[in-house]
């Protein structure tokens, strides 16, 4: 039986209200508040009409991270639209789910330089300051992109811009044209690193202009962070094993 990851009525508003203050401040900006109200109204209407909406926790990517805690940003587009998949973290699925093709290619790229991750749930990355943010935070069952034009991008653009305004050094990993369009939200003089490549989907991972396969983003990210006095990210997801930390250093 798949994990029940359906969004419950009224849960979206409650989760937004429970976000850390730094994120709530973004949602309270007038233009963002209007966009979120539009999203919220549409989601609640669709739930009332019997639609199945995923995930159960749309704001999960923000729950444990304030903007100052973010060290790496990985942008996705749409939550997974099948039952038991989407968790509120871009690219992540529960461990008992089959590994999606894009995530498999991400793991293949990590394995070039580091131990291959064994868990499909990427929560361990989040605990290390990796923001796994989709640009649309809800989707209907079997209908990819179904909420993409309902106001979510105004909300998530504002969240990305807030992260980029924070002065602590961050790496933005922009995979595919959709994510790369968000580079405009990261000021060139902000002191952050932006790395771009094709999307890890099998349809594009090996294609020009910058194939995802062989991009080296995970090692480049760690090298850049360490040069600025920060710990490397344990991309294997086993950061609690201190004896392995050296495997992720330069």
From Swiss-Prot:
Gene symbol?
A: ung
Outline the segment boundaries, as ranges, of region: Disordered. 228-250
| HAMAP family in the cross-refs | UDG (MF_00148)
Provide the protein name: Uracil-DNA glycosylase
Q: Name one GO molecular function term.
A: uracil DNA N-glycosylase activity
Organism phylogeny? Bacteria, Pseudomonadati, Pseudomonadota, Betaproteobacteria, Burkholderiales
Q: Which PROSITE patterns match?
A: U_DNA_GLYCOSYLASE (PS00130)
Q: Keyword annotations for this protein?
A: Cytoplasm, DNA damage, DNA repair, Hydrolase
Which Gene3D superfamilies does the entry link to? Uracil-DNA glycosylase-like domain
